[in-house]
C-alpha cells in the first residue's frame, strides 16, 4: 500500500474486537494516518484509545470505506444508523461471517458498493487468509484498495461468485479449528506414550507449524510431501492408515458445509 493511498482515503471501522483490532493494527503499521480512521466501539480498550484514531467521535461526511467488524447478530440493529452512506461512493467492506451481500443491500440500498470478505483467526497475528467478493456497484479501483486493506492481516484471494463463500467458510474459516484439534490430538497421543504434557504439546505445536510453513513455501504439493516422509511399512504409514480407515478415505473430506449446520 502506498502512502498516497492512505492519505486520500478515510475509513470508518465498526467494531474493534479481535479481528477489528488486528486490521487496525495492520493499517497503522503500514502507515495509515490515524487521523483518517474513525472507530465506533461501545467499549474501547486502552490500546484503541492510545492509537490516536478517532474513537466514538463525529463521523466524516464522505468516508471512502466503512469496514463492518461487528458480530453478525448486531448488524440489523447497528447498520441502519449508517444507511445515509448507502447508494453512493462509500464502499462497505464486511468481515461479518455468514451475512450475504443481499442482506446488506436490503439495509443500505441496492446501489451501495459492498464487499463481503471472510478472514480466519490467524489474521490476529497477520497470518490469515481472506477471501473477498464484491457486488456490481464496486469499482475495480475500490476492489483493489479493499484487497490492500485486507492484506494487513494476511493473504487475500478473490472469488468468482458469492456462492463459493460457503466452501471458503468450511475450509479456511473453520480450518484453524480442525488444526487446533489436530494439535491437541497429537499432544494427547504423545502424553499417552510417556511424554510429559508440556513437552508433548510443544512437539505437537512445532510439528504443525513447521509442516505448515514447509507446505506453504515448497513447490512440492502436500500429497508428495506426505509420501516423501512415509516409509513403507513404517510408523508414519501405520498412523496414516488409521487416519484414513473409513469409508470415505478421510474424515476431513466429509466435514460439514455451512449449509449442513
What kind of region is each of these model predictions?
Residues 103-113, 129-167, 178-217:
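Internal alpha-helical scaffold of NAD(P)-dependent oxidoreductase catalytic cores
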Residues 175:
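Aromatic-residue-lined binding/catalytic grooves and analogous aromatic/hydrophobic interfacial grooves
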Residues 23-24, 45-47, 59-132:
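Rossmann-like NAD(P)(H) cofactor-binding subdomain of soluble oxidoreductases
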Residues 2-54, 191-192:
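NAD(P)+-binding Rossmann beta1-loop-alpha1 motif at the extreme N-terminus of oxidoreductases
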Residues 253-261:
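Single conserved hydrophobic/aromatic residue that forms the stacking wall/gate
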Residues 34-37, 88-89, 113, 198:
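Short acidic capping loops at alpha-helix termini that bridge into adjacent secondary structure
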Residues 155, 193-252:
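C-terminal substrate-binding/catalytic lobe of Rossmann-fold NAD(P)-dependent oxidoreductases
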